[in-house]
Amino acid sequence: MRRLLPLLFVLAACSTAEAPPADLLDRAKFKQVLLGAQLVEARLNQEMVIEHRTDNPVEVYYTDLFKKEDVTREQFERTYRFYTEHPAEMKAIYEELIVELDSLKENVVDQPVVPK
């Protein structure tokens, strides 16, 4: 019996991934909103560091993001919490986001500069 107990723990740890609860955003939608959140954070960083902006429009930007994506803050936060409790799945999502962000960056860098 003592030898079987560690084996049971290993088997339990290797079981199939838990499906997200029904009230969460689906993976594709969550990834899209998370991409938008990364762009919001980049914009805020740009405004604060480069433009020395003193007001803090973070709530406005996130409200606009959630409205554009047709999700609520609560849906996003519940889904985010779920994936933080499933780090392997969250890591996979972030790896996909990095690819998408790199693609967006390349598209911006390749744009011709328009004189003012």
Regions found by a protein language model. Name each.
Residues 5, 25, 53-56:
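Residue-level detector of secondary-structure boundary/capping sites
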